[in-house]
């Protein structure tokens, strides 16, 4: 969290009697601010005529500029904290790298496919939308959940970069497998096809990860040259740190303002979609956390593994659903409900993670 030392992830157990002891006001009441941002965004979308259309019209290449701006502001301070000269220590951790790839690209899509069919056997549009959400692995918002939970910043940077590469290469193939081939082979009915190109996915990755990653790297490089590492981390980083949460709150307001009318006008459908999403986030996060602990990862890398496993790229999922099935489709609604459930659930899991941090002992293997 912003109260933690900016010099890198903490790997020793928390000594405080309370998880929130010593945190700034902004961090301590994070759940309150996020709930307020969601409520405010939903209210704006519902009460201000034409606001959702106005926000939706400000886009380039299918990418919402207000959301892109919010994510850039959110991710830049976190990525400016990363010590890029330590990334080789992460890439050399084979247990972390292999576990992350397996959980994200083998287990994650399969779990969402199973849950979508279990919970929504009679609602094919919503089911397809959920499967698309499961295919879109997180490359953006996960960096702030990881930072708030005192995860390994360098590991998060490496894993989201790895996810972005696999997203470009594998999204279309996995979409064909889970939406077309597998349902037919299992006798579950006719499949669906996605209208999405590698170029569109690459553009999404470049905007939501590439821009803030390059900005963070250049800021640290030139900042350390001018101020030295100690000065950069003690003087500059504390000034930009709070902007990560400002960007997160702005993004949430814009996102829910865009979809406020849709969400509030179909509450029963939202509830049906929410159930498999809740099960998915719980299974992925707790399963990945247990895996990290079982294979001997330290707390910071276990937290990073868990949050990268549970998070999803809702921007890509919504864009694909709208481009393929239309803005008023059930598939698009499933994509919209994704962040409605993901944001508060992962905020809660940040506090769970911090509480469990004290169960880890210093000096465990895997770091």
Residue ranges and their predicted role:
Residues 1-80, 85-309, 314-367:
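Alpha-helical transmembrane segments of multi-pass small-molecule/ion transporters
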